[in-house]
């Protein structure tokens, strides 16, 4: 692996871990049973709370997106990014970063997505 790629991967891993540490800290104060957005960069950068404020809507939506995330990373960190919040509704957008991996990327993505959905159904059966 090229040295610059290795360094970028290390930097991405540190950034991700910092976000997860911040999310875990914020989860302590989160209200259970609210709406959650989780996934990769499209979710992380989606300005849902700004839209809600602009429309005068009094809703709580938690955002636990992490730019660059793949489905295997979400599977590993579902506790901090989903289950600690005990959401009643979840919007998931993840998988685009999985598609640039070698081999059967689409097949692997579908398999991983099914695992994510199965774990949510098991742990949060009332969640939509």
Predicted regions and their residues:
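N-terminal secretory targeting modules
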Residues: 1-36, 43, 47-57, 88
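Charge-dense, low-complexity intrinsically disordered segments
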Residues: 10, 68, 103, 107
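Soluble or luminal CAZymes and related metallo-dependent hydrolases
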Residues: 15-18, 70-74, 108-112
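Conserved beta-strand elements of the Class I
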Residues: 36-38, 62, 90
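Short, well-ordered amphipathic alpha-helices
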Residues: 40, 47, 114-118
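Solvent-exposed loop/turn segments at secondary-structure junctions
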Residues: 41-44, 68-71, 96-100
């Amino acid at each position: 692996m090229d040295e610059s790629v290795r360094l970028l991967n290390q930097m991405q891993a540190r950034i991700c871990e910092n976000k997860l540490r911040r999310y875990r800290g914020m989860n302590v104060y989160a209200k259970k049973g609210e709406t959650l957005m989780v996934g990769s960069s499209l979710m992380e950068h989606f300005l849902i709370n700004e839209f809600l404020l602009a429309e005068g809507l009094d809703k709580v939506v938690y955002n636990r997106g992490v730019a660059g995330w793949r489905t295997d990373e979400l599977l590993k960190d579902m506790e901090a990014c989903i289950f600690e919040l005990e959401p009643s509704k979840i919007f998931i957008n993840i998988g685009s970063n999985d598609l640039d991996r070698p081999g059967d990327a689409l097949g692997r993505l579908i398999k991983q997505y099914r695992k994510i959905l199965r774990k949510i159904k098991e742990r949060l059966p009332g969640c939509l």
